[in-house]
Amino acid sequence: MKLAPQESLDAIAPSTGTRPRPKESDLPRRAFVTSDGVQLSYIRQGSGRPIVLLHDWSQCAEEFKHQIGPLSAQYDVIAVDQRSHGESQKVSYGLKISRLAKDLFELLTKLDLNEVALLGHSMGSSVIWCYIDLFGSERLSKIVLVDQSPFLTSDPNWTQQELEDSGAIFTAQQVFDIVAALRSKEAENVTRQGIDGIVTKHATPEMKEWIVQCNLKMPGNLAGTLMYNHWHMDWRDLIPRINLPTLIISGRASMIPWKSQAWIHRQIKGSQFEVFEEAEGGQHFMFIENPEKFNRMIMKYLG
């Protein structure tokens, strides 16, 4: 199955089955068990003020490897493999944004972290929004939102302005079709095609393969379940109520329309907004394509 360009927002995860196992990283790993019995793996490195990195849908904590090293020179960096992702336990339950937010709450509580900066890439931003909605911002100091639409699935009754502001790039039928693709025998091919749609033309084959292999760690049927929930979440009522210092990062050539990120910026009082141009790696994975600029931006913001 070949997806149309607008259907390739995130890497499409493969179906279950036999696949080559991606190589393990030498990043320092730890684990904890959630209240519903799921073992989550996380990377922790450095000391200082804490920053927690939350990856995208069907991706993994190792994708922040270019950030973990530099940031850990000044900060206590924690990058979590969310449930059923990466090295964390694969389970068929709790695959919804609200449970991922609960997992985050339990991790911060277990580690007794306060004044935490949260950085979320794509779905990771949705987890941050849900965390704030459910648990408030008492433990938090700052947030960084990287390339996530306020609402991914469009309503046929919307005006053009509503469509632009929401950043919706899928119809309801397209969501159903992608879920089916995730469970098909062609899912890994769909994954590889999807990756091509979310990186710039400057991305090397090795870089794309690394992203694919990270994606392949999540079974396709589980990815489909989480995707259905994630892509139907509407955060437009929550975003204007955020009262934390916020940095929004977008890519000019990203599948997530940059104008929707500008809408988020307008809604959050005092927020900062940065856009990577295409020549700067300004697609969905700008933190992988141009880690030097991304890291400088984050470190300046964190102070």
Report the location of each language-model feature.
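Alpha/beta-hydrolase fold catalytic core
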Residues: 1-51, 73-75, 114, 217, ...
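Conserved HGGG/HGGXW glycine-rich cap/lid loop of the alpha/beta-hydrolase fold
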Residues: 38-93
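Conserved loop-alpha-helix segment in the C-terminal half of the alpha/beta-hydrolase fold
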Residues: 69, 241-283
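Conserved acidic catalytic loop of the alpha/beta-hydrolase fold
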Residues: 98-116
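Gly/Ala-rich beta-loop-alpha elbow adjacent to hydrolase catalytic centers
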Residues: 120, 124, 128
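Flexible "cap/lid" loop of the alpha/beta hydrolase fold
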Residues: 129-134, 139-183
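Conserved alpha/beta-hydrolase catalytic His-Asp/Glu region
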Residues: 154-163, 177-240
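Catalytic histidine-centered segment of alpha/beta-hydrolase-like enzymes
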Residues: 279-291, 295
